[in-house]
Amino acid sequence: FVGRDVTGSDLLRDFDAILLSGGAEAPRDLPVPGRDLDGVHYAMDFLEQQNRRVAGDALEREREILATGKNVLVLGGGDTGSDCIGTSHRQGAKHVYNFELLERPPEVRPEDAPWPLHPMPSQILRTSTSHEEGGSRDWGVSTTRFTGSNGRVEKLHAVRVRFGPPDPANGR
């Protein structure tokens, strides 16, 4: 189907199901003190600007978000976080750190933990090409606040977290 027009009738005739998986573009905020400091950005704002730059399009925002020459901290260990890591490296970040709330997943799925029972379905340690570009990764880190001066972020405060077995009363 690549390179040619496909009608809705073609899709209905040739497939039993059609899955549209464009990803979430609405950010999930981190409601902690200092979140509004300059220098704390949503991933999609950063990635969208880079996509516009690569396409040669004008940026719609007054203020550019660039990782060039900076120490960058990416919060979140999913695909979007991985995209931010790789983009930061390609923009010439000084160093890229990645914090994930969940504990480090196993490198191999334990035989006694089929996919529905593991904390994240099919979650095993994934290292993307973005991670292979360098940087540091840490797991079990929960952000408690950001602090800074003159309205600009300078420090992230966090605590180490460990997840225990689910509570039998509520499953959490």
Feature roles, as predicted:
Residues P27-Q91:
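Glycine-rich dinucleotide-binding loop and its adjacent helix/turn
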